[in-house]
Structure formats: C-alpha cells, structure tokens
Amino acid sequence: MNQLILASQSPRRKELLDLAGFSYDIQASHLKEEINRNLSPAENVQWLAEQKANDIQRLNPKAVVIGADTIVAIDGKCLGKPKDKKEAAFMLQLLSGKTHQVLTGVTVQSENRKETFYEQTEVTFWTLTQNEIDRYIETGEPLDKAGSYGIQGKGALFVQKIDGDYFSVVGLPIAKTVRVLETFGITPF
C-alpha cells in the first residue's frame, strides 16, 4: 500500500482524515500562501493546492500526497488568512450580512498521476455588530483561518445559511477527497 501524506498542518484537515479512518503522515509544505490577483478564486485554490502537493511530492516520490487550500471570496475579492487582528476585523465587517463563497482546492498526487479539483460553498452571515467582531477576534480563533472565521468553532454563530459542502468550508471536502483517493488505491477505514 502506498504511503499517504497530508501536505498541511491544518488541525481541521487532520481531523477530517482521521474521521474517515485514513492512515497517513503529515509533512507540511512551507510555501508562502500568496493569493495571485491575476487568477480567479477557483484557479487560486487549485494552484495553491498543487504547489503544496508538488513541494512534498518532490521529497517523497513514492507517496500519494494531498495538498489543499481554502479561500473565501466576496464580490470577486479573495480573502486568505488575516495578517493581524485589524485585517481580521476588516474581513469580518466585509462578510457581515452578506453571502460569500468558500472555495477549497485539493490536489491528490502520486509519482505519475495528479488530480486537482475544488468545491465551492455559499455561506451567508448574519449582520454582525462591532462588539461581536471584537469579542470574536479576542478569542484568537479567526487569526489562522481564511476569511477570518472557523465554521466549526465560534464562527458558526455568525452563519445564517450554508449551501454546499460543510466540510469544504472546514478545510477539506472529505467525501470527494475519499473518492479521488480510492482511484489512487488508498482507502479509508
């Protein structure tokens, strides 16, 4: 059986692979995650997922590697992880009372094959008060998440509606990822 490697330090992606029952190793890619303003949100997440998978694949040519990236898009603007509390507040104000898209790109790659895809989910936020935003930022939760919120944590309190794959918003569309991994000969549980 091929070795499976997750090219991410995301605890949420780890939890989802654990939930599915995979045996895998973690080797985080240390590539700088920069959004390319010349690419669409869908192109960005797929490109970043491929870069992460390529980075780890070079070091482990016999392994099957999963690279993933998540961004939030609103009004054509891509939101990655905030640089600081001020940027987190700006992002949350931007999302307040509106519908945005959460896109997660995934690359599954072996020595001689690569499959890249993305999932897009629509998320609508309630209108947020500045007090709610400030209190949420003080928890520290939004500082390592695309769009400055975690739907699986306290950020769930901001979500009015979701249309699409919840797990994609968390960081990995696990059902589709499992199906792709199975075509590489990697099966869960």
Curated annotation (Swiss-Prot):
Site location (Important for substrate specificity): 12, 70, 152
GO CC annotation: cytoplasm
EC number, as in UniProt: 3.6.1.9
Reaction equations catalysed: dTTP + H2O = dTMP + diphosphate + H(+); UTP + H2O = UMP + diphosphate + H(+)
Cofactor: a divalent metal cation
Major localization class: cytoplasm
UniProt keyword Hydrolase present: yes
Broad EC category: hydrolase
Entry superkingdom: Bacteria
Localization: Cytoplasm
Keywords, sorted A to Z: Cytoplasm, Hydrolase, Nucleotide metabolism
Active site: 69
Pfam family, one: Maf
GO molecular function: dTTP diphosphatase activity; UTP diphosphatase activity
GO biological process, one term: nucleotide metabolic process
Family the entry assigns: Belongs to the Maf family. YhdE subfamily.
UniProt function note: Nucleoside triphosphate pyrophosphatase that hydrolyzes dTTP and UTP. May have a dual role in cell division arrest and in preventing the incorporation of modified nucleotides into cellular nucleic acids.
Name of the protein this chain belongs to: dTTP/UTP pyrophosphatase
Origin species: Bacillus pumilus (strain SAFR-032)
Encoding gene (name): maf
